[in-house]
């Protein structure tokens, strides 16, 4: 789904697919830009197997049920008559069609005397995220999905195989426009130092974060830092979908090696549930020092992070720390572009306030750096490279970067809705 759109406009054009024309659907991971349209596609292609990793088989229903609830709310809030795009019954029916694959173990699909072999590999982007190798009639196609090669605190980096020479490589390009200026561990240390300074001056540190993967990763980071006394002890508040997913992360961590996470972290950090239902930035007073770890990561309206942020901007003791990508059109993206003492408006509350709190950005992305992707392509030696999952400027960086390799392999920068032979 297109995260910048609402309603039917957010969906891919599934009408280009003939009825009953798909043999299988491979879900790479559970973020809604990949997962959100699956119930609709699955209904249109009832014969298709739905292939997922084991963690994804547990997480996807929770993500879709939350998406259903959000759409029900937005139906009236934003006057979107077609919402919800799917029902809870659709989610249950889809879950029954999930076929969970183990990482690194090939799975064969046969049809009309032909056989395709499919293998999932851990992609490191988020728990359950998969890259996909398709082997068919002597050819190999590798789809990275959203991928991260470096280790996180809760998750190992991608375990992609060495396949050179490869026939087709489908590459994500999310960070094509982003040049890394600091190593991940250095960014984590900088975040912890900012938290510590905020707490020591009696302030509140808000960390807006994506519910799936990012909140759980930050809980592990906070726990590890607290063990080493890198920031003063203080109340830590969490809420929303990120906390609802904790039990599933814990269960997966107990039964597999897919994730380094235990819900015992919540007790050791003395995590408190944020129970405030009504927030009025003009009258609500929050007590510091404290840390708030809340979704959404882009500070979208009507989310816990947005509501808490509205109460923090007026005090220079406070900090708001963004740890992932914020689309420029979202409140988070707009706040990052706002200068100190410049007025920022919280549209949900019709409330404007000069920015006096510290606003900082930390590069803790779940996507691989462009240079890492560049080196990955060179190592795999594909005959054809297909660029996906990135804005046009991001994909153009890769197009230009590989110009010198044009004699070695073809680079395809596809247009939406156009069919290509690879």
Model-derived features with residue positions:
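Acidic/glycine-enriched edge-of-secondary-structure segments
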Residues: 1-2, 23, 142-144, 148-150, ...
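Internal alpha/beta domain cores that form substrate/cofactor-binding pockets in large enzymes
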Residues: 360-380, 384-422
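A general structural motif
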Residues: 184-188, 269-280, 298-301, 340-344, ...
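Short, solvent-exposed amphipathic alpha-helical segments in soluble enzyme
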Residues: 135-137, 158-162, 186, 221-228, ...
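Hard-cation-handling environments
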Residues: 192-331, 388
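Conserved acidic residues
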Residues: 23, 167, 290, 318, ...
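His/Asp/Glu-rich metal-coordinating catalytic cores
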Residues: 1-26, 31, 35, 40-217, ...
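Short, flexible loop segments at boundaries between secondary-structure elements
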Residues: 240-247, 251, 320-335, 340-363, ...
């Amino acid at each position: 789904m297109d995260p910048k759109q609402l309603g039917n406009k957010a969906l891919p054009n599934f009408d280009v697919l003939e009825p009953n024309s798909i043999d299988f659907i491979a879900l790479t991971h559970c973020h809604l830009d990949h997962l959100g349209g699956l119930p609709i596609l699955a209904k249109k292609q009832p014969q298709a197997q739905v292939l997922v990793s084991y963690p994804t088989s547990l997480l996807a229903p929770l993500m879709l049920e939350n998406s259903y609830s959000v759409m029900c709310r937005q139906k009236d809030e934003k006057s979107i008559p077609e919402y919800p795009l799917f029902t809870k019954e659709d989610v249950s029916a889809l879950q029954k069609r999930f076929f969970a694959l183990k990482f690194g173990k090939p799975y064969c699909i046969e049809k009309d005397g032909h056989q395709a072999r499919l293998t999932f590999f851990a992609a490191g982007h988020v728990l359950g995220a998969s890259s996909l190798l398709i082997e068919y009639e002597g050819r190999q196609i590798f789809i990275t999905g959203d991928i991260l090669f470096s280790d996180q605190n809760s998750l190992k980096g991608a375990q992609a195989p060495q396949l050179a020479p490869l026939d087709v490589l489908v590459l994500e390009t999310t960070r094509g426009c982003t040049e890394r200026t600091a190593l991940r561990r250095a960014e984590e240390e900088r975040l912890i130092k900012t938290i510590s300074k905020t707490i020591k001056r009696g302030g509140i540190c808000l960390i807006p974060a994506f519910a799936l993967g990012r909140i759980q990763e930050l809980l592990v980071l906070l726990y590890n830092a607290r063990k080493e006394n890198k920031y003063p002890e203080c109340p830590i508040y969490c809420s929303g979908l990120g906390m609802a997913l904790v039990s599933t992360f814990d269960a997966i961590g107990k039964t597999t090696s897919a994730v380094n996470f235990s819900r015992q972290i919540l007790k050791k950090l003395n995590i408190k549930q944020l129970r405030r239902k009504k927030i009025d930035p003009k009258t609500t007073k929050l007590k510091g020092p404290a840390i708030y770890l809340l979704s959404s990561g882009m500070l979208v309206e009507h989310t816990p992070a947005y509501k808490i942020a509205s109460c923090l901007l007026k005090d220079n003791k406070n900090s708001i720390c963004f740890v992932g990508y914020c689309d420029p059109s979202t409140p988070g993206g707009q706040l990052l572009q706002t200068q100190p003492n410049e007025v920022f408006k919280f549209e949900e509350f019709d409330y404007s306030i000069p920015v006096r709190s510290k606003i900082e950005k930390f590069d803790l992305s779940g996507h691989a750096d462009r240079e890492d992707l560049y080196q990955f392509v060179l190592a795999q030696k594909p005959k054809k490279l297909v660029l996906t999952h990135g804005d046009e400027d991001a994909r153009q960086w890769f197009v230009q970067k590989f110009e010198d390799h044009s004699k070695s392999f073809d680079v395809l920068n596809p247009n939406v809705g156009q069919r290509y032979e690879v």
